[in-house]
Amino acid sequence: TRSSVESRGLGDVYKRQILIYTAPEIARNLLRFRYSMLEQARTRAREMNLQGALFPWRTSNGEEASAYYAAGTAQYHINADIMYALKKYAEITNDKSLLYNEGVEMLVETARMWVDLGFYSDRKGGKFCINGVTGPDEYTTVVNNNAYTNMMARENLFFAVKTVKEMLDAYPDQYENLKHRTNLETDEIDAWQKAADNMYVPFDRKLGIHPQDEDFLDLEAWDIKNTPRELFPLLLHYHPLVIYRHQVIKQADVVLAMFLLGNLFTDKQKKRNFDYYDPLTTGDSSLSACIQSIIAAEVGANEKAMGYARYAVLMDLADVGGNMAEGCHIASMGGTWMVAVYGFAGMRDYDGHITFEP
């Protein structure tokens, strides 16, 4: 299956949200496009000294096309992002054919990658930790225990366990075929469950927030308010090493986790996380404003919700970034749909259950 839409970064989360509900056949084709890259992803994992498969951060043909590893290849969460899109698609469409064929094979290989990438740390009470990764925020790179990455990896592992066990119970012939295709061993499934059950997720009890990563709260906060507007986006005006030693965020990270996995956060945690991270977020990525708008609406910051919504809607219409000549921001367009549906209409769709709270 080929695609005219490149596979890049968080597009699996942003574009597929709207497509699953409005054009599920296209969402299905895009997931099958990802599956067509699985062999290259297996090769990429071996290059990175890992088992399983590691999908590229940017690609049009299955080969990694990112120029800068810290803001590209280090975003291992791409595996979990793709599997999140698969999970949403399966829950909403009930398409067992895709899930139990191409989908489950990707689940097996991505789960293998996670248990090989992480380890059980005695210093963290035996919790499963994932080090040397970059989360969605590309202004904070190659860190330990990025909250978004760990939480999404946990969902990836849980979903892999659930799907494989369902196949074993309900479709034993297909399960045997899967074992043959992937050399799956029963003890691997137990290893996925154990890693997911013991996943380390940073939390600061004093502040009542989820630190973006292990060391984020120890960094000096960037003075965004007094940084001249002409020096944004920061990545075009400051050396990465200057940016990396500060608390400054290119795009929603913990806040994105609160949108995708909102049922895992309390209302108080959402409010405190948003209040802490929003002032540190530059919005230098076109993918940030839509997520900030959705969570702002949820926590009652209505003026901010509307302001971010306007910014997201005008990203291409008003050429906010000054780069429309290079093409439309497809993922951001998907984000504007999410603002209307998830933000102002208050829709949530966790575990296949849809609710509305406008």
Regions found by a protein language model. Name each.
Residues 1-10:
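Single conserved hydrophobic/aromatic residue that forms the stacking wall/gate
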Residues 109, 113-184:
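Acidic/histidine-rich catalytic neighborhood
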Residues 107, 292, 340:
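Hydrophobic, well-ordered secondary-structure elements that form the walls
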Residues 329-358:
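Catalytic cores of secreted or luminal carbohydrate-active enzymes
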Residues 79, 83-86, 149, 157, ...:
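TPR repeat positional signature
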Residues 25-84, 90, 94-101, 114-127, ...:
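Helix-terminus loop motifs that line ligand-binding clefts
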Residues 11-37, 101, 158, 165, ...:
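Active-site core of glycosidic bond-cleaving carbohydrate-active enzymes
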Residues 25-31, 163-174, 304, 346-357:
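Acidic/polar loop patches that form or flank catalytic/metal-binding clefts of enzymes
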